[in-house]
Amino acid sequence: MKRFAFKMKLKPGFEREYEKRHSELWPELRKQISDSGVKNYSIFWDKDTNILFGYQEVEGDANSQDVEAADEITRKWWDYMSDIMDVNPDNSPVTIPLMEVFHLD
């Protein structure tokens, strides 16, 4: 199982909307994430900086973000979220990978 961590940026004032949209995650997106090998996925919010910290555990060799980028459902989700996050020209969230420096099982 591979572990991935990354950070994203939430626009100020949208923390409740971000949480609401994720609490209503589309069933087809939930399935797509699971089918791409993600077995554990959490997102945390730093209220002082509006930085979102994502953590995933992924089975197999694929980086789940690469798999998701090719998926139409994911692209629709990106469009849906683009008004409340920093995004790239294709509306994917600006995602900065983080390097693991310690792990303890």
Residue spans of the language-model regions?
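A general secondary-structure signal for short beta-strands and their flanking turns/coil
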Residues: 1-3, 49
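Active-site-flanking beta-strand signature of metal-NTP-handling nucleotidyl enzymes
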Residues: 4-9
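Beta-strand elements of well-folded, non-transmembrane domains
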Residues: 10-12, 60
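Short amphipathic alpha-helical segments
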Residues: 14-39
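Short, glycine- and small/hydrophobic-rich beta-strand elements in well-ordered beta-sheets
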Residues: 30-53, 57-59
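An amphipathic, aromatic/His-enriched active-site/gating alpha helix that lines ligand/cofactor pockets
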Residues: 36, 58-96
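A hydrophobic membrane-anchoring alpha-helix module
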Residues: 103-105
